[in-house]
Amino acid sequence: HYVAARLHRVPASLPFFLPLPFLSPFGTLGAVIRMRGTIRDRAALLDVGASGPLAGLCVAIPLYLYGVAHSKVISTDGIEGVELGDSLLLKLMDHVAAPHYGAGQTILLSPIAYAAWGGLFVTMINLLPLSQLDGGHVAYALFGDGHNRRAPTLHRLLLAFFAVNLSASLVRDALHGVLLANVGNNVGRTLFWFVWFEMLGILGGFARGRRAEQREDDDPDGDNEDEDDRPVELSPRVRAAATLGIVLYSSFARESHSALVWLPWFGALGLLLALEARSGLLQPHDLLAHPPTDAASKPLGATRKVVAIVTLAFFVLLFLPTPMAL
Protein backbone atom coordinates (compact mmCIF):
# COMPACT_ATOMS: atom_id res chain seq x y z
CA HIS A 1 0.00 0.00 0.00
CA TYR A 2 2.63 2.47 1.08
CA VAL A 3 4.79 1.91 -2.00
CA ALA A 4 1.80 2.17 -4.38
CA ALA A 5 0.61 5.32 -2.62
CA ARG A 6 4.04 6.93 -2.91
CA LEU A 7 4.31 5.97 -6.60
CA HIS A 8 1.03 7.79 -7.24
CA ARG A 9 2.13 10.70 -5.03
CA VAL A 10 -0.65 10.13 -2.53
CA PRO A 11 0.32 11.51 0.91
CA ALA A 12 0.44 8.39 3.08
CA SER A 13 1.82 7.40 6.44
CA LEU A 14 3.98 4.40 7.20
CA PRO A 15 1.95 1.37 8.33
CA PHE A 16 0.35 1.49 11.78
CA PHE A 17 0.31 -1.90 13.52
CA LEU A 18 -3.14 -2.95 14.82
CA PRO A 19 -2.74 -5.07 17.97
CA LEU A 20 -5.74 -7.12 19.08
CA PRO A 21 -4.45 -9.30 21.94
CA PHE A 22 -7.72 -10.70 23.33
CA LEU A 23 -10.24 -10.82 20.48
CA SER A 24 -7.87 -12.15 17.81
CA PRO A 25 -6.12 -15.53 18.11
CA PHE A 26 -3.27 -13.99 16.11
CA GLY A 27 -2.86 -10.98 18.38
CA THR A 28 -3.32 -8.54 15.52
CA LEU A 29 -5.55 -7.35 12.69
CA GLY A 30 -2.55 -6.42 10.56
CA ALA A 31 -1.76 -2.79 9.86
CA VAL A 32 -3.22 0.30 8.21
CA ILE A 33 -1.84 3.37 6.52
CA ARG A 34 -3.39 6.82 6.69
CA MET A 35 -3.88 8.66 3.41
CA ARG A 36 -4.51 12.38 3.42
CA GLY A 37 -6.18 14.26 0.60
CA THR A 38 -8.09 12.94 -2.40
CA ILE A 39 -6.69 10.24 -4.66
CA ARG A 40 -6.15 11.46 -8.21
CA ASP A 41 -8.22 8.94 -10.19
CA ARG A 42 -9.68 5.44 -10.07
CA ALA A 43 -6.54 3.89 -11.56
CA ALA A 44 -4.45 5.19 -8.67
CA LEU A 45 -7.13 4.06 -6.21
CA LEU A 46 -7.06 0.54 -7.66
CA ASP A 47 -3.27 0.35 -7.49
CA VAL A 48 -3.28 1.44 -3.85
CA GLY A 49 -6.18 -0.83 -2.88
CA ALA A 50 -5.17 -4.00 -4.73
CA SER A 51 -1.42 -3.93 -4.13
CA GLY A 52 -1.58 -4.92 -0.46
CA PRO A 53 -3.92 -7.93 -0.71
CA LEU A 54 -2.26 -9.28 -3.86
CA ALA A 55 1.22 -8.92 -2.36
CA GLY A 56 0.04 -10.62 0.81
CA LEU A 57 -1.47 -13.51 -1.15
CA CYS A 58 1.81 -14.00 -3.02
CA VAL A 59 3.38 -14.74 0.37
CA ALA A 60 0.52 -16.48 2.20
CA ILE A 61 -0.44 -19.00 -0.50
CA PRO A 62 2.99 -20.67 -0.94
CA LEU A 63 3.58 -20.58 2.82
CA TYR A 64 0.26 -22.34 3.45
CA LEU A 65 1.03 -24.98 0.83
CA TYR A 66 4.40 -25.65 2.44
CA GLY A 67 3.04 -25.47 5.98
CA VAL A 68 0.05 -27.76 5.45
CA ALA A 69 2.24 -30.31 3.68
CA HIS A 70 4.34 -30.48 6.86
CA SER A 71 1.38 -30.60 9.26
CA LYS A 72 0.49 -33.61 11.42
CA VAL A 73 -2.51 -35.91 11.26
CA ILE A 74 -3.94 -36.45 14.76
CA SER A 75 -6.91 -38.24 16.31
CA THR A 76 -9.98 -36.18 17.17
CA ASP A 77 -10.62 -38.22 20.35
CA GLY A 78 -10.57 -35.89 23.34
CA ILE A 79 -9.06 -33.06 21.32
CA GLU A 80 -9.67 -29.48 22.38
CA GLY A 81 -8.91 -26.36 20.40
CA VAL A 82 -10.19 -23.97 17.78
CA GLU A 83 -11.44 -25.50 14.55
CA LEU A 84 -10.48 -23.15 11.74
CA GLY A 85 -12.88 -22.55 8.89
CA ASP A 86 -12.48 -23.55 5.26
CA SER A 87 -12.76 -21.45 2.13
CA LEU A 88 -12.80 -22.57 -1.49
CA LEU A 89 -9.13 -21.65 -1.84
CA LEU A 90 -8.18 -23.46 1.38
CA LYS A 91 -10.06 -26.59 0.29
CA LEU A 92 -8.19 -26.53 -3.03
CA MET A 93 -4.80 -26.12 -1.34
CA ASP A 94 -5.61 -28.85 1.19
CA HIS A 95 -6.54 -31.17 -1.68
CA VAL A 96 -3.20 -30.46 -3.36
CA ALA A 97 -0.80 -30.44 -0.40
CA ALA A 98 -2.36 -31.67 2.87
CA PRO A 99 -1.64 -35.18 4.16
CA HIS A 100 -4.51 -37.63 3.82
CA TYR A 101 -6.50 -38.55 6.91
CA GLY A 102 -9.44 -40.80 7.68
CA ALA A 103 -12.51 -40.83 9.89
CA GLY A 104 -11.84 -39.75 13.45
CA GLN A 105 -8.76 -37.81 12.39
CA THR A 106 -7.93 -34.21 11.57
CA ILE A 107 -4.94 -32.07 10.68
CA LEU A 108 -2.98 -30.14 13.29
CA LEU A 109 -1.61 -27.20 11.33
CA SER A 110 2.09 -26.49 11.60
CA PRO A 111 3.06 -23.02 12.87
CA ILE A 112 3.84 -21.91 9.30
CA ALA A 113 0.45 -23.09 8.00
CA TYR A 114 -1.32 -21.48 10.96
CA ALA A 115 0.40 -18.14 10.33
CA ALA A 116 -0.45 -18.37 6.62
CA TRP A 117 -4.08 -19.19 7.48
CA GLY A 118 -4.14 -16.06 9.62
CA GLY A 119 -2.79 -14.02 6.71
CA LEU A 120 -5.48 -15.38 4.40
CA PHE A 121 -8.13 -14.70 7.06
CA VAL A 122 -7.09 -11.05 7.49
CA THR A 123 -6.89 -10.64 3.70
CA MET A 124 -10.46 -11.95 3.38
CA ILE A 125 -11.70 -9.32 5.83
CA ASN A 126 -9.73 -6.61 4.07
CA LEU A 127 -11.21 -7.62 0.71
CA LEU A 128 -14.80 -7.05 1.84
CA PRO A 129 -16.04 -4.75 -0.97
CA LEU A 130 -17.24 -2.10 1.47
CA SER A 131 -16.29 1.27 2.90
CA GLN A 132 -12.56 2.07 2.85
CA LEU A 133 -11.33 -1.47 3.21
CA ASP A 134 -9.09 -2.51 0.33
CA GLY A 135 -12.00 -4.38 -1.23
CA GLY A 136 -14.00 -1.16 -1.03
CA HIS A 137 -11.21 0.72 -2.82
CA VAL A 138 -11.12 -1.91 -5.56
CA ALA A 139 -14.91 -2.05 -5.96
CA TYR A 140 -15.18 1.76 -6.15
CA ALA A 141 -12.33 1.89 -8.66
CA LEU A 142 -14.16 -0.67 -10.82
CA PHE A 143 -17.76 0.52 -10.50
CA GLY A 144 -17.46 4.18 -9.49
CA ASP A 145 -20.35 5.88 -7.70
CA GLY A 146 -22.62 2.96 -8.56
CA HIS A 147 -20.80 0.96 -5.91
CA ASN A 148 -21.85 3.45 -3.21
CA ARG A 149 -25.49 2.84 -4.10
CA ARG A 150 -25.01 -0.92 -3.72
CA ALA A 151 -22.88 -0.78 -0.57
CA PRO A 152 -25.74 -0.76 2.00
CA THR A 153 -27.30 -3.82 0.36
CA LEU A 154 -23.98 -5.67 0.31
CA HIS A 155 -23.47 -4.71 3.94
CA ARG A 156 -26.87 -6.06 4.98
CA LEU A 157 -26.04 -9.38 3.35
CA LEU A 158 -23.56 -9.92 6.20
CA LEU A 159 -26.41 -9.60 8.70
CA ALA A 160 -28.64 -11.84 6.58
CA PHE A 161 -25.90 -14.47 6.38
CA PHE A 162 -25.55 -14.44 10.18
CA ALA A 163 -29.32 -14.62 10.73
CA VAL A 164 -29.86 -17.50 8.30
CA ASN A 165 -26.85 -19.43 9.60
CA LEU A 166 -27.83 -19.07 13.26
CA SER A 167 -31.52 -19.76 12.63
CA ALA A 168 -30.77 -22.89 10.61
CA SER A 169 -28.48 -24.20 13.36
CA LEU A 170 -31.06 -23.54 16.08
CA VAL A 171 -33.92 -25.10 14.11
CA ARG A 172 -31.83 -28.18 13.30
CA ASP A 173 -30.91 -28.70 16.95
CA ALA A 174 -34.48 -28.05 18.10
CA LEU A 175 -35.72 -30.79 15.77
CA HIS A 176 -33.16 -33.16 17.30
CA GLY A 177 -34.06 -32.14 20.86
CA VAL A 178 -30.64 -30.63 21.66
CA LEU A 179 -31.40 -26.91 21.27
CA LEU A 180 -30.16 -25.73 24.68
CA ALA A 181 -27.26 -28.17 24.69
CA ASN A 182 -25.73 -26.58 21.58
CA VAL A 183 -26.95 -22.98 21.65
CA GLY A 184 -23.60 -21.65 22.92
CA ASN A 185 -21.64 -23.42 20.20
CA ASN A 186 -24.08 -22.27 17.52
CA VAL A 187 -23.85 -18.65 18.63
CA GLY A 188 -20.06 -18.82 18.80
CA ARG A 189 -19.77 -20.33 15.32
CA THR A 190 -22.08 -17.83 13.62
CA LEU A 191 -21.49 -14.54 15.44
CA PHE A 192 -18.48 -13.44 13.39
CA TRP A 193 -20.37 -11.89 10.49
CA PHE A 194 -22.80 -10.09 12.81
CA VAL A 195 -19.79 -8.54 14.54
CA TRP A 196 -18.42 -7.33 11.20
CA PHE A 197 -21.81 -5.99 10.17
CA GLU A 198 -21.70 -3.80 13.28
CA MET A 199 -17.96 -3.13 13.06
CA LEU A 200 -18.26 -1.58 9.61
CA GLY A 201 -21.00 0.70 10.91
CA ILE A 202 -18.83 1.68 13.88
CA LEU A 203 -15.83 2.48 11.68
CA GLY A 204 -18.03 4.38 9.23
CA GLY A 205 -19.57 6.42 12.04
CA PHE A 206 -16.21 7.44 13.49
CA ALA A 207 -14.83 8.23 10.02
CA ARG A 208 -17.80 10.47 9.24
CA GLY A 209 -17.34 12.23 12.56
CA ARG A 210 -13.71 12.98 11.69
CA ARG A 211 -14.72 14.30 8.27
CA ALA A 212 -17.32 16.56 9.88
CA GLU A 213 -14.73 17.93 12.33
CA GLN A 214 -12.32 18.56 9.47
CA ARG A 215 -14.97 20.44 7.48
CA GLU A 216 -15.80 22.52 10.53
CA ASP A 217 -12.13 23.38 11.02
CA ASP A 218 -11.80 24.31 7.34
CA ASP A 219 -15.03 26.36 7.29
CA PRO A 220 -16.20 27.23 10.83
CA ASP A 221 -18.96 29.51 9.46
CA GLY A 222 -20.19 26.98 6.87
CA ASP A 223 -23.69 25.56 6.59
CA ASN A 224 -24.03 22.28 8.54
CA GLU A 225 -27.64 21.49 7.66
CA ASP A 226 -26.65 18.27 5.91
CA GLU A 227 -24.95 17.05 9.08
CA ASP A 228 -27.96 18.02 11.19
CA ASP A 229 -30.34 16.08 8.90
CA ARG A 230 -28.33 12.87 8.79
CA PRO A 231 -30.58 9.81 8.54
CA VAL A 232 -28.39 7.62 10.77
CA GLU A 233 -28.63 8.66 14.41
CA LEU A 234 -27.33 5.66 16.37
CA SER A 235 -24.01 6.71 17.90
CA PRO A 236 -20.97 4.60 16.95
CA ARG A 237 -20.04 4.51 20.64
CA VAL A 238 -23.45 3.05 21.55
CA ARG A 239 -23.15 0.57 18.70
CA ALA A 240 -19.64 -0.42 19.81
CA ALA A 241 -20.64 -0.85 23.46
CA ALA A 242 -23.71 -2.93 22.55
CA THR A 243 -21.75 -5.15 20.16
CA LEU A 244 -18.96 -5.71 22.68
CA GLY A 245 -21.50 -6.58 25.36
CA ILE A 246 -23.21 -9.12 23.09
CA VAL A 247 -19.87 -10.75 22.23
CA LEU A 248 -18.63 -10.89 25.83
CA TYR A 249 -21.95 -12.24 27.16
CA SER A 250 -21.97 -15.00 24.55
CA SER A 251 -18.39 -15.93 25.47
CA PHE A 252 -19.13 -16.18 29.20
CA ALA A 253 -22.42 -18.03 28.62
CA ARG A 254 -21.12 -20.44 26.02
CA GLU A 255 -21.11 -23.53 28.26
CA SER A 256 -24.54 -22.78 29.73
CA HIS A 257 -27.56 -24.90 28.78
CA SER A 258 -30.09 -22.73 30.60
CA ALA A 259 -32.82 -20.83 28.80
CA LEU A 260 -32.71 -18.21 31.59
CA VAL A 261 -29.09 -17.46 30.64
CA TRP A 262 -29.66 -17.22 26.88
CA LEU A 263 -32.98 -15.34 26.80
CA PRO A 264 -31.32 -12.04 27.90
CA TRP A 265 -28.70 -12.49 25.16
CA PHE A 266 -31.30 -12.95 22.43
CA GLY A 267 -33.23 -10.02 23.93
CA ALA A 268 -30.16 -7.77 23.73
CA LEU A 269 -29.51 -8.89 20.16
CA GLY A 270 -33.11 -8.14 19.20
CA LEU A 271 -32.96 -4.73 20.89
CA LEU A 272 -29.81 -3.73 19.01
CA LEU A 273 -31.32 -4.85 15.70
CA ALA A 274 -34.51 -2.92 16.52
CA LEU A 275 -32.40 0.21 17.07
CA GLU A 276 -30.63 -0.43 13.76
CA ALA A 277 -34.02 -0.76 12.04
CA ARG A 278 -35.36 2.41 13.66
CA SER A 279 -32.41 4.76 13.25
CA GLY A 280 -29.35 2.85 12.19
CA LEU A 281 -27.80 0.57 9.62
CA LEU A 282 -31.12 -0.87 8.43
CA GLN A 283 -32.25 2.62 7.39
CA PRO A 284 -30.90 4.49 4.32
CA HIS A 285 -27.44 5.79 5.20
CA ASP A 286 -24.10 6.87 3.76
CA LEU A 287 -21.76 5.41 6.38
CA LEU A 288 -20.18 3.05 3.86
CA ALA A 289 -19.91 5.53 0.99
CA HIS A 290 -16.44 5.67 -0.54
CA PRO A 291 -14.99 9.18 -1.01
CA PRO A 292 -14.77 10.22 -4.67
CA THR A 293 -11.52 10.57 -6.57
CA ASP A 294 -10.55 13.82 -8.25
CA ALA A 295 -11.34 12.34 -11.68
CA ALA A 296 -14.19 10.00 -10.70
CA SER A 297 -15.61 9.88 -14.23
CA LYS A 298 -12.36 8.55 -15.73
CA PRO A 299 -12.84 4.77 -16.19
CA LEU A 300 -10.22 2.09 -15.68
CA GLY A 301 -8.25 0.71 -18.57
CA ALA A 302 -8.75 -2.89 -19.69
CA THR A 303 -5.72 -4.25 -17.81
CA ARG A 304 -6.70 -2.64 -14.53
CA LYS A 305 -10.28 -3.89 -14.93
CA VAL A 306 -8.90 -7.43 -15.08
CA VAL A 307 -6.79 -6.77 -11.98
CA ALA A 308 -9.86 -5.43 -10.15
CA ILE A 309 -12.00 -8.43 -11.12
CA VAL A 310 -9.27 -10.89 -10.09
CA THR A 311 -8.82 -9.10 -6.76
CA LEU A 312 -12.55 -9.22 -5.98
CA ALA A 313 -12.67 -12.86 -7.12
CA PHE A 314 -10.11 -13.65 -4.44
CA PHE A 315 -12.61 -12.44 -1.84
CA VAL A 316 -15.05 -15.10 -3.07
CA LEU A 317 -12.31 -17.75 -2.98
CA LEU A 318 -11.21 -16.68 0.52
CA PHE A 319 -14.70 -16.25 2.02
CA LEU A 320 -15.07 -18.24 5.25
CA PRO A 321 -18.73 -18.94 6.14
CA THR A 322 -17.62 -19.89 9.66
CA PRO A 323 -14.09 -18.55 10.27
CA MET A 324 -13.86 -19.76 13.88
CA ALA A 325 -15.80 -19.79 17.13
CA LEU A 326 -15.71 -16.43 18.92
Indicate residue ranges for each PLM-predicted region.
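Hydrophobic transmembrane alpha-helices and their immediate loop junctions
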Residues: 1-326
